[in-house]
Design a protein with these regions (language model features):
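Acidic helix N-cap motif at the loop->helix transition within catalytic regions
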Residues: 35-37, 62-70, 117
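Short aromatic/hydrophobic "clamp" motif used to bind/position activated sugar donors
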Residues: 105
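Short, acidic, metal-binding catalytic loop of nucleotide-sugar glycosyltransferases
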Residues: 41-50
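Conserved nucleotide-sugar donor-binding catalytic segment
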Residues: 98, 137, 152-235
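A conserved acidic beta->alpha catalytic loop
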Residues: 49, 57-66, 85, 109
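Glycine-rich, basic loop-to-helix element that forms the pyrophosphate-binding segment
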Residues: 83-100, 110
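C-terminal subregions of glycosyltransferases and related glycan-biosynthesis enzymes
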Residues: 2-20, 194, 201, 217-317
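Conserved donor NDP-sugar-binding/catalytic core segment of glycosyltransferases
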Residues: 117-149
Length: 317
């Protein structure tokens, strides 16, 4: 069956045609064979059927290529692309998005799972809310065996000024991708956060308070503490780049973002940059800035919940 030419497909993202909008799901993977089947099966098991799954193999050396080939044979909606050298997550995302034909786009990880109605619920939301560019949903945290650990509700988009408020379950219109372009390959492990900051400057982002996604917390997670410094560094780079322009965020949220930057500057010994960031926070919202710093000082004296910064909606400090 010949593939549809993406340049000739009509945009049905506003629900103006009887043909259901096509949803493109990009799934990048690198040596992810342990949980890859579960991730793919959660896509195949969606109640919404008008989707394509683009598997991007970032030069895996385990059983990942065999698993991908198996699913490409099983379902013609599944396609695959392989990098001949490892290019890391942001470039794998860009490779998948460049091949996507959908009216709506999303991506998922090789160790996480969609709930069965995830794509249907988010697609319906975008169809019913034409002014919204990105919808994002509640998640739950699961362990390496798939057991429930705790909830991760979607946060107000205004909080992007200091935290990745969107979490790991989202859907956006093709117009968002066409406006923003690809993910920043220089911000590995914070590429999604920077993308949402860009999106928030241009589009309406709306939470959908239904649990539609299972985020797995395990020893092989990219967001485990071994990558903590890289995540914090790149997230701060993204935040400093966009924070001055987040006029839609509440003043107290922008102030908190500047205090996060100040705290990270202190951690790396850059007291001049810390003072500048904190002064900006005080100018933006004096009261919340002072109370936030006091609370963070108290937290520093208490045991930290393991990995809390690295989870969906985790704060970058």
């Amino acid at each position: 069956v010949p593939e549809t030419d993406p340049t000739t497909r009509k945009d049905h993202s506003n629900g103006t045609s009887e043909q259901p909008p096509l949803v493109s799901i990009v799934l990048p993977t690198y040596n992810g064979s342990k949980y890859l089947r579960e991730a793919i099966e959660s896509c195949l098991g969606q109640t919404y059927q008008a989707w394509e799954l683009i598997l991007v193999d970032d030069c895996s050396s385990d059983e990942t290529p065999d698993i991908i080939a198996e699913y490409c044979r099983r379902d013609r909606r599944v396609r695959s692309i392989r990098h001949e050298v490892n290019k890391k997550l942001p470039q794998a995302l860009n490779t998948g998005h460049a091949a996507a034909r959908g009216d709506y786009l999303t991506w998922t990880s090789d160790d996480n799972r969609y709930r069965p109605a995830a794509i249907e619920e988010m697609t319906r939301f975008l169809q019913e809310h034409p002014a919204v560019g990105v919808v994002y949903a509640d998640c739950v945290l699961i362990d390496d065996t798939g057991r429930y650990m705790r909830d991760f509700p979607a946060l107000p988009a205004s909080r992007l000024a200091y935290v990745d408020a969107l979490g790991a379950c989202f859907l956006y219109r093709r117009s968002v991708y066409e406006t923003l372009g690809g993910y920043d390959v220089e911000l590995f492990l914070a590429e999604d956060y920077e993308y949402w900051l860009r999106a928030y400057r241009e589009f309406e982002l709306a939470p959908l308070h239904k649990v539609l996604y299972e985020y797995r917390w395990h020893t092989g997670s990219l967001t485990k503490s071994a990558n903590r410094r890289a995540i914090r560094t790149n997230a701060e780079r993204a935040l400093r780049r966009h924070l001055p322009y987040l006029r839609r965020s509440l003043p107290q949220d922008r102030a908190r973002g500047w205090t996060v930057c100040a705290a990270n500057a202190v951690r790396r010994g850059d007291l001049v940059q810390a003072a500048t960031a904190y002064a900006t926070a005080l100018r933006t919202a004096p009261g919340p800035s002072l109370s936030y710093v006091a609370r963070k000082l108290v937290e520093r004296l208490q045991p930290r919940r393991a990995g809390s910064e690295m989870l969906p909606n985790g704060e970058w400090s």
